Structures are given as structure tokens and as C-alpha cells.
Amino acid sequence: MEYRSLMLDDFLSRFQLLRPQINRETLNHRQAAVLIPIVRRPQPGLLLTQRSIHLRKHAGQVAFPGGAVDDTDASVIAAALREAEEEVAIPPSAVEVIGVLPPVDSVTGYQVTPVVGIIPPDLPYRASEDEVSAVFEMPLAQALHLGRYHPLDIYRRGDSHRVWLSWYEQYFVWGMTAGIIRELALQIGVKP
């Protein structure tokens, strides 16, 4: 697939036809969810945030809107939508959820479910000052280009853990966020 010419209809068709199999074991029992907001344009965008430098965990990192599943959340999808509204003012009613990717185990002990949703291009994003320092859009075709991600093996407590690194403009995209973007690319058939 030529990444420079990805159109929204092509992305949607590939995502629906190549639906992921979600049956994997996890060591983490605490649930979290992130929203992968795809901006509805002929050539779609990917909405990302940069976390506030004042946060205790993952300060300053590029991330998807998301967080822990609360007792009030009916599902991981509801949690992702709630967090997106809290962090960047995306109303849940504005998100067309098209599916989920297989959960990812975080280094902080959560099983994180990525929820893929389509959002309108004209939403007035408003970053929560406590949690988000920037909201930006990256062309989806660029985000899904696997050649932009570089592996780094980290050794922690005797175990090797691979993370992926990339840059977009002034933003350093790495860790779980880069890994989820790569999984989305592989899900729709992008070849390494």
C-alpha cells in the first residue's frame, strides 16, 4: 500500500475487512482505554496530544486521549470517549466508533484498549490545562508509514522490551503511542 495516498474510504474499508482478532492473554488486570481519533477528511488526519509537563506519569509525552476505566464507565469504549471529552473536549456523540485494536500491556500495569473512532474535521478542540499542553493533527498517511518508526530495545528487570521512536514536526512520538500507531498500520495491511 502506498502510504502517501491513503484516502479515508480506503482506510475504513481496510480496517473493517481486516478486523483484528482479539484473544490474547494479559498479565495486567487494570483496564484503560485510549481513543485513536481519525479526523474525517478525504485524506484523513490523526489527532494526538502532548501531555502536560506537570503530570506525575508520562509528563510531556505524545499520547492519544485516554486513561483508566472508571466504575462509572459502561465499557472500555465509554472510558475512551469520556477521557477524550475530558482531555480535548471531543463530545462522545461526535465520535463514530469503528472498532478496537487488540489490548496492549503498559509498563505501568494497565491493559490498554485502543478504540478507533472517526471525528469531524471542524471540532473546536480545547485542551484540559491540567492534562494536555498541545493538541495536533498528523496526516494519517504519514503516521501509518512504518519506515518512520525506529526500534529501541530497553532492558528492564532482566527483560527486553522493544519500543518504537519517531518524530513529527517538533513532537517526539514513542513508546506505547508509537506502538499503537504501528499496530494500526499493520492492521490495515501496510507492509514493513
Swiss-Prot record:
Coiled-coil segments: none
GO biological process terms, semicolon-separated: nucleoside diphosphate metabolic process
Superkingdom of the organism of origin: Bacteria
GO MF annotations, alphabetized: coenzyme A diphosphatase activity; magnesium ion binding; manganese ion binding
Enzyme class label: hydrolase
Residue span of motif Nudix box: 67-89
InterPro entries: CoAse, NUDIX_hydrolase-like_dom_sf, NUDIX_hydrolase_dom, NUDIX_hydrolase_NudL_CS, Nudix_NudL
Cofactor(s), by name: Mn(2+); Mg(2+)
Binding site for Mg(2+): E83, E87
Keywords, alphabetical: Hydrolase, Magnesium, Manganese, Metal-binding
Chaperone listed as a keyword: no
EC number, UniProt record: 3.6.1.-
PROSITE patterns hit by this protein: NUDIX (PS51462), NUDIX_COA (PS01293)
Protein family per UniProt: Belongs to the Nudix hydrolase family. PCD1 subfamily.
Listed NCBIfam families: PRK10707.1
Role played: Probably mediates the hydrolysis of some nucleoside diphosphate derivatives.
Protein name: Uncharacterized Nudix hydrolase NudL
Species per Swiss-Prot/TrEMBL record: Shigella sonnei (strain Ss046)
